[in-house]
Amino acid sequence: MKLYCLSGHPTLPCNVLKFKSTTIMLDCGLDMTSTLNFLPLPLVQSPRLSSLPGWSLKDGNAFLDKTELIDLSTVDVILISNYHCMMALPYITEHTGFTGTVYATEPTVQIGRLLMEELVNFIERVPKAQSASLWKNKDIQRLLPSPLKDAVEVSTWRRCYTMQEVNSALSKIQLVGFSQKIELFGAVQVTPLSSGYALGSSNWIIQSHYEKVSYVSGSSLLTTHPQPMDQASLKNSDVLVLTGLTQIPTANPDGMVGEFCSNLALTVRNGGNVLVPCYPSGVIYDLLECLYQYIDSAGLSSVPLYFISPVANSSLEFSQIFAEWLCHNKQSKVYLPEPPFPHAELIQTNKLKHYPSIHGDFSNDFRQPCVVFTGHPSLRFGDVVHFMELWGKSSLNTVIFTEPDFSYLEALAPYQPLAMKCIYCPIDTRLNFIQVSKLLKEVQPLHVVCPEQYTQPPPAQSHRMDLMIDCQPPAMSYRRAEVLALPFKRRYEKIEIMPELADSLVPMEIKPGISLATVSAVLHTKDNKHLLQPPPRPAQPTSGKKRKRVSDDVPDCKVLKPLLSGSIPVEQFVQTLEKHGFSDIKVEDTAKGHIVLLQEAETLIQIEEDSTHIICDNDEMLRVRLRDLVLKFLQKF
């Protein structure tokens, strides 16, 4: 069993597991932090951005050639754990020869579609007059400043996919539900479990009859809107692969939400606007719910909330119809009937308005001060670029970062000098290291496998030994482009036996309570299922010269020698030898058993726990005679 690590980002994993002749890809996250190396894409040509200085020559490291770790066309199945971990799916399904099946829950697919659609829309609606590609040249790249000169396999970086590729990729997905058992080629069974992180987010159990691998990715124990995490099903795992922990282990999500609300209120009271760069699904639901409870008490009920995204309407509607994927409290509201999320009431009362873009209706309804939720969190494309240009010159305005995926200082770099206030309130509800340690003690896997980053403290806080995984035995770590041999071997395989063959078996008791029977059978294997069938009967001799068909050529079953069991008591064996005329017998003890020496016959008998050897000098009659005496002490079956 081997694990191939294709991603260096622990929160956006892409691993391939080879298990029982089945090749399974675990997630296909898209690391978009590379976008921070590029200038923002404004909706309108920006003289300020256009006049930013270009790069200057630096001495760099030599370019490393691309190395193929695995042929992705050999992948049989892709398991998706949440919608953030499927953003690279079109690159794999459309450009690698992949012909397998993708499994994911319905909310994961629908919200993943929205994220991809928003990404494609943001990129395609800002066509560039010219496209730069010279920087991918090996000789040029090593002269670029860091981090571009240190980036891995820059020549393989691709343009954003199209909606046609997105639709084609999503058509290969088969929808599954929590605890649904899916059989893969008769070899292994995979089961999605609720991970508690996002709508439809899953952990996966991959098991055969005698082995069990758990894949934990992007899980949460906090009580937010998704179904709670299923921990019980993770018990008794041989291997637990752990990815997708919180990116900000020192930040408390509840404290960050409180800070978000207080900074938002302070800015609006002073006449400023608040910009919240965000994804169109996920944390935004929780932020809107907190604001629903907060704005009236803070006297902000007249301040408009704007949600701007090409998929804003779809996102808000989807969150209300996936009732069975929500936590119990929100599920119960559906039967009252009430909308599960309070943002429905915010929309009805016109406190929250959503728009596909800043054109059209938004331009007519726009009034300040206000709060704007829009993308993209990298500040490199999307409507957020326009608002950064619009509001960045005033110290009354504030940008609040809630998504932890991007460094806010790097995101702000192209907009400097910046007068507006910047608040960093990253909200990441995924498991922290304390919760992981408690979880591992409860489920007790035999082995834990995780990214290298989780086995050592963060570089900026090297003294914080509590910010790493602590388990026994110590976790096995991996890094990008590594192949890990998982530390357990398959020992058993399940085989069914046909009733007529079972009826023919004659068990013999070799020890009290233990019986054995020999089986002569034909092993039939199909779709990784094994069946023992009765051996074919010997073919009857046929007269004439009729030619046999190939199908009639059934191999004859040889008559097998009986198997032996039992042990030889040395004292009784010596007495038996003496009764049969052997004299001058000596017995010597060895590390493995005994040696019986027949000095007169110049013969040696080695008696060990699992074998007996008779060594004599070319006297076959003597050997056979001694063999028969040995067999008297053993059982045949």
Swiss-Prot record:
Residues 527-553 are annotated as: Disordered. One of its GO terms (cellular component) is INTAC complex. It is found in: Nucleus; Cytoplasm. SUPFAM superfamilies: Metallo-hydrolase/oxidoreductase. There is a cross-link at residue 58 (Glycyl lysine isopeptide (Lys-Gly) (interchain with G-Cter in SUMO2)). Gene3D superfamilies: 3.40.50.10890, Ribonuclease Z/Hydroxyacylglutathione hydrolase-like (3.60.15.10). The keyword Acyltransferase does not apply. The keyword Nucleus applies. It comes from the Eukaryota. Component of the Integrator complex, composed of core subunits INTS1, INTS2, INTS3, INTS4, INTS5, INTS6, INTS7, INTS8, INTS9/RC74, INTS10, INTS11/CPSF3L, INTS12, INTS13, INTS14 and INTS15. The core complex associates with protein phosphatase 2A subunits PPP2CA and PPP2R1A, to form the Integrator-PP2A (INTAC) complex. INTS9 is part of the RNA endonuclease subcomplex, composed of INTS4, INTS9, INTS11 and inositol hexakisphosphate (InsP6). Interacts with WDR73; interaction is required for the assembly of the RNA endonuclease subcomplex in the cytoplasm. Although strongly related to RNA-specific endonuclease proteins, it lacks the HXHXDH motif that binds zinc and participates in the catalytic center. Its function as endonuclease is therefore unsure. Belongs to the metallo-beta-lactamase superfamily. RNA-metabolizing metallo-beta-lactamase-like family. INTS9 subfamily. PANTHER family: INTEGRATOR COMPLEX SUBUNIT 9. Component of the integrator complex, a multiprotein complex that terminates RNA polymerase II (Pol II) transcription in the promoter-proximal region of genes. This is Integrator complex subunit 9.
